[in-house]
Amino acid sequence: MTVKDFIDKLLGRQTSSASTAKQRLQLVLAHDRSDLNPELLAQMRREILEVVARYVEIDIEEGDVSLETEDRMTALVANLPIRRSIQQSPNGGTL
């Protein structure tokens, strides 16, 4: 998600159909270039959420893990709203 997309979403602006089509095409290209099948991407998402949830309380429903392509480079992007930090004890357990 670009900064412009974030601001548009924050302000409740609708995206144009051309913009939506472009985002979908970029997603298809990112999946194709990364050679990750949807099942593997879903497994990665679950595991990433599990690891992050050990340290902070996250909003899983609002979170997003996706592939994004920009300038011929594909990145795995995790956008995870954090509710609060989880206190860790000195021995590694939660308090």
From Swiss-Prot:
Belongs to the MinE family. It comes from Synechococcus sp. (strain CC9902). InterPro entries: MinE, MinE_sf. This is Cell division topological specificity factor. One of its GO terms (biological process) is cell division. The gene is minE. It holds the Pfam family MinE. Gene3D superfamilies: Cell division topological specificity factor MinE. It comes from the Bacteria. Keywords: Cell cycle, Cell division. The keyword Transferase does not apply. Prevents the cell division inhibition by proteins MinC and MinD at internal division sites while permitting inhibition at polar sites. This ensures cell division at the proper site by restricting the formation of a division septum at the midpoint of the long axis of the cell. SUPFAM superfamilies: Cell division protein MinE topological specificity domain.
